[in-house]
Curated annotation (Swiss-Prot):
GO terms for biological process: cysteine biosynthetic process; methionine biosynthetic process; positive regulation of transcription by RNA polymerase II; regulation of sulfur amino acid metabolic process; regulation of sulfur metabolic process; regulation of transcription by RNA polymerase II. It comes from the Eukaryota. The keyword Transcription regulation applies. This is Transcriptional activator of sulfur metabolism MET28. It is found in: Cytoplasm; Nucleus.
Length: 187
């Protein structure tokens, strides 16, 4: 069964229910149940109701607040014996799926386009961040190599000065030893 046939079947069920004496309150409750269960029929009926009432904001706020839509001031309870009004709604409902599916396709395409653009921006930012990180890594490696060279240079200087100090200490200790020997011999 195609989507359009399913839609026609559901709208016919509502038409039959309204002929059997379903009042506005029951229809309103049924509509609220369809909308709250996120059914396709409920969303289409809501769209149709919003378009036909002209007071979409008030109607949406009533539905969101859980108020009974039948109490909506600008909606009128259909009079008994007026089947023509309900069949007119059914005809409009059958036309609605085509426009809604086109709108849904446009929305999906727009969403897909935005997601593609966002993904592209993300990939560009990721590449840029990787490039920046590689540059930072290269700079840090250069600094590390310079610091290692400096450490090596300082170690060599340290060894040189240690050797100098040892030489000076050795000369001083020999001199001191010779002074002690002379004093001891002179006695």
């Amino acid at each position: 069964m195609s989507a359009k046939q399913g839609w026609e079947k559901k709208s016919t069920n509502i038409d039959i229910a309204s002929r059997k004496g379903m009042n506005v309150n029951n229809l309103s409750e049924h509509l609220q149940n369809l909308i709250s269960s996120d059914s396709e029929l409920g969303s289409r009926l809501l769209s149709l109701l919003l378009v036909s009432s002209g007071n979409a904001e008030e109607l949406i706020s009533m539905i969101n607040n859980g108020q009974d839509v039948s109490q909506f001031k600008k909606l009128r309870e259909p009079r008994k014996g007026k089947v023509a009004a309900t069949t007119a709604v059914v005809v409009k409902e059958e036309e609605a799926p085509v426009s809604t599916s086109n709108e849904l396709d446009k929305i999906k395409q727009e969403r897909r386009r935005k997601n593609t653009e966002a993904s592209q921006r993300f990939r560009i930012r990721k590449k840029q961040k990787n490039f920046e990180n590689m540059n930072k890594l290269q700079n840090l490696n250069t600094q590390i190599n310079k610091l290692r060279d400096r450490i090596e240079q300082l170690n060599k200087e340290n060894e040189f000065w240690k050797a100098k100090l040892n030489d000076i200490n050795e000369i001083k200790s020999l001199k001191l030893l010779n002074d002690i020997k002379r004093r001891n011999m002179g006695r």
